[in-house]
Amino acid sequence: MNKHLSGSQIRQIWLDFFKSKKHEIIESKSLVPINDPSLLWINAGVATLKKYFSGEENPINPRLANSQRCIRANDIENVGVTSRHHTVFEMLGNFSIGDYFKKEAIEFGYELLTKFYGLNKDKLYITIYEDDNDAFNYWVGQGINPHHIIRCDRKRNFWDLGSGPCGPSTEIYYDRGEKYDPNKLGEKLFFEDIENDRYIEVWNIVFSQFNNTGNNNYTELLRKNIDTGASLERFACILQDVPTNYDTDLYLPIIRTIEKHTNHKYVVDHYFSKDQSEQDVLRAFRVIADHLKCGVFAIADGVLPGAKDRDYIIRKLLRRAFVYAKKLNAKPEYLVETINVIINTYSDFFKYLIPNKEIVIQAITNEANNFTKTLDYGFEIFNEAKTTNNITAETIFKLVETYGFPLDLIKELSAEAKIKLDLDGFEELFKKHQEISKANNGEVGLKKQNENLLKFKTPSKFFYDKNNIKTKVVAIFDDKFNPVDQIEVGSGWAVFESTPIYATSGGQRFDEGYCLKKGNLVVHFDNVIKAPNKQHLHHFKKASFWLNEKVELMHDENWRKLVRKNHSLEHILHATLKNTISETIKQSGAFKSAAKATLDFNYPTRLTDEDLDKIETKMRQVIADKIPVTVHHVDYETSQKMNAIAYFEEEYKKHELLRVIKIGDYSVELCGGTHVDNTKEIEECFITNLYSLGAGRWRIEIMSSYETIYNYLVDKQNEIKQEKDHMFNELGNYDLTHYLDFSKKLHSFNLPNSIKDLRKTLRAFEQIKEEYKAIKLELDKKKTKDRANQIKKLALDNLEHKIVLLFFDKEEHKALSIAHSELVNEKPDHLFFFINKSDNKINYLIGIKNATYKLNAKLLIDKVNAMFGAKGGGKQNFAQGGFSTDKDVGKLKADFVNICIT
């Protein structure tokens, strides 16, 4: 066994081995799934390749391999307790998309494990699906002892999500020896699937060969696949012969850094200790190392600590790390130094960590500083609980989920203070929470393969530079993608030999496109998408097409021109953000249409209005410089030398020519969209908005062209005029004696005369609107108080009886409530009964401060409920309720008077 191998070497051996087996090495993708709402995180190596397994796209090579960073945050309470639990980890994988299958996958696995990693074949143990005789024979053929192979049921060795691709699997285990078998159970641990640290699963291979229609009806897949996953951390643990994953060179440098700033020691051999205090120290170090590493990786991928979804998960993990650091009495300096060590440990492979280092440090230290008060609050709860000797389930849950307190720390502090915990109640709350989280987390499900589209290989060429093309129909599909020869006045998809109509791709919306027959416009396509083999699928409704029919296609040239302007402007915006704000900014999403373009990006703080002005000024300069926009078709190496930017999940084909859009020396990006020929064609630009998409995520909205921006300016002028008129009309109902300055300011506010003044004008108008809201609130409060005083006077004029019964018609509820409350306090021996009729709804308030047995609010509310079938309730001093009725006012008054005198 190669004990000298480092984690980096283990990873590289994996990638080099599969490269030698003609696999394409796929770079590790972002932890944030792109265009996949089913996943919160990339949680497996196959997750970034789903489009290939589903058949939505064909890969650049049917053989793929990777080392993918992943996050799984479902069982964070196990981190540091078990030898192998992590929230962030690397999954090594090799994949076959319709290429090699079971025999080759097993051969590759055996060869890599025994010849390259040097594992003893006699220590390999295998699980297979109970009916998979082929897998059994292949393993035995490689030299595996048949006694080391066990057949398992569907639950353990059949991968099936209920519908879509599925199949049997085989798992590879390694026997680490008796020192990890304290009870000397031997092979029983493996054969009875007992949780242990001796027989460690290192590799799982799924043979995706069936399609489940959804009702457990299985058919053979047209394209059989191999999906594998192996843990780099587990390989390192085995090959470096250490007790746990945390004792490998992937984690120990991080732990040693934390250790320097505490009075505690991380002793690897304490793994074998039964002393609980020693185990607690080990766990604390491991949790801090794991959670900080997870935070570093996620934040560098654009996820900032926040209040919901993945932002909340990172916040919770960081806070757990901070709590454990406090438990170890770690000095504040530990944090930044540990972050630096994490980045240094992994940046040789994960190069994206280095340019994002400052943002990572800033985000984590900010979270630590903000959490200090929260941490203190948590400890205050324990001090308060000492007086009651009890902490409720709800409080425990709040500490764990909201404040990030580890449950074991809560137990420890409670034991020290002799405080009782409602752990049963907490477990019930936590179980419900986990069920919700699991439902929302998403599985690595693969969509059902569409075999018709996968098999469809007939070429169809897209022409960027043609407005219209005479062509013919080469394929027709119904709405379920079944191939047909023709469709008569119906809906479906048509594929043409050639097309000038752009299909939705790379964030650019499809062209407005049309089909002409014999010179007459007959079809407007309402959607255009790409098939797995890149043909453009044109969707139509209430139209007729048949195979080999000759037609003419065209796109709306005016639409295309506007899209080209906005797409090129979006590239300029992207480059300007990098040049003006921060080189670390990267596009995380984009949308381009004729009306506008948007760009999503990650940045810790909101851009100021001054930032936006600066960005806009620079973009206008680029437009004014009349820079040529050129298209280059180059190989991958050349695109790298050009420093071409490429994001998202596109696998830019390393064996094909790539399309690079170059805007002089200002912007260079790989892009398949449509663009202007020169920046002067963009004419003008304006940033219409900056939206927050959550913690640290932003969307800038921009538009181009004189006409579009002029129309936007006119719309804004009309909006401002309408809002001014509305404010004047509203304020006309009030006495503005004390607000003359604001009235003059509103009257003199000028509408913007040019687009360059618009942002400044809009900012000023937003301030006016805020001022208006504050003034309106004051005026409404005064109006309500004045009306309440009038109601009070009316009541005070009717104190001859102990019950003051007053009727109101469509009276303001707030004024009634204020008057009623003040009267009850000022005249404690009187009962005030206010009835307010609005349309067919009756609402009433009853109150008396000095209630008696014979005169109280509860007595009257019960009578009202009985007489009218009303829903009301309260206590002796105060009650309220309501009901619906169509009785006239005179009859109602008589009924209420009768209630009061009986």
Swiss-Prot record:
UniProt superkingdom: Bacteria
Cofactor dependency: Zn(2+)
Gene3D superfamilies, A to Z: 2.40.30.130, 3.10.310.40, Bira Bifunctional Protein, Domain 2, Threonyl-trna Synthetase, Chain A, domain 2
Enzymatic reactions: tRNA(Ala) + L-alanine + ATP = L-alanyl-tRNA(Ala) + AMP + diphosphate
SUPFAM superfamilies: Class II aaRS and biotin synthetases (SSF55681), Putative anticodon-binding domain of alanyl-tRNA synthetase (AlaRS) (SSF101353), ThrRS/AlaRS common domain (SSF55186), Translation proteins (SSF50447)
Pfam families: DHHA1, tRNA-synt_2c, tRNA_SAD
InterPro entries attached to this UniProt entry: aa-tRNA-synth_II/BPL/LPL, Ala-tRNA-lgiase_IIc, Ala-tRNA-ligase_IIc_anticod-bd, Ala-tRNA-synth_IIc_core, Ala-tRNA-synth_IIc_N, Ala-tRNA_ligase, Ala_tRNA_ligase_euk/bac, DHHA1_dom
Cellular component terms (Gene Ontology): cytosol
EC class of the enzyme, as a word: ligase
UniProt cross-references to SMART domains, sorted A to Z: tRNA_SAD (SM00863)
Alphabetical UniProt keywords: Aminoacyl-tRNA synthetase, ATP-binding, Cytoplasm, Ligase, Metal-binding, Nucleotide-binding, Protein biosynthesis, RNA-binding, tRNA-binding, Zinc
Cofactor binding summary note: Binds 1 zinc ion per subunit.
Record-level GO BP terms: alanyl-tRNA aminoacylation
Record carries keyword Zinc: yes
PANTHER family found in the cross-reference section: ALANINE--TRNA LIGASE, CYTOPLASMIC (PTHR11777:SF9), ALANYL-TRNA SYNTHETASE (PTHR11777)
Function: Catalyzes the attachment of alanine to tRNA(Ala) in a two-step reaction: alanine is first activated by ATP to form Ala-AMP and then transferred to the acceptor end of tRNA(Ala). Also edits incorrectly charged Ser-tRNA(Ala) and Gly-tRNA(Ala) via its editing domain.
Official protein name in the record: Alanine--tRNA ligase
Taxonomic source organism: Mycoplasmoides gallisepticum (strain R(low / passage 15 / clone 2))
Upper taxonomic lineage: Bacteria, Bacillati, Mycoplasmatota, Mycoplasmoidales, Mycoplasmoidaceae
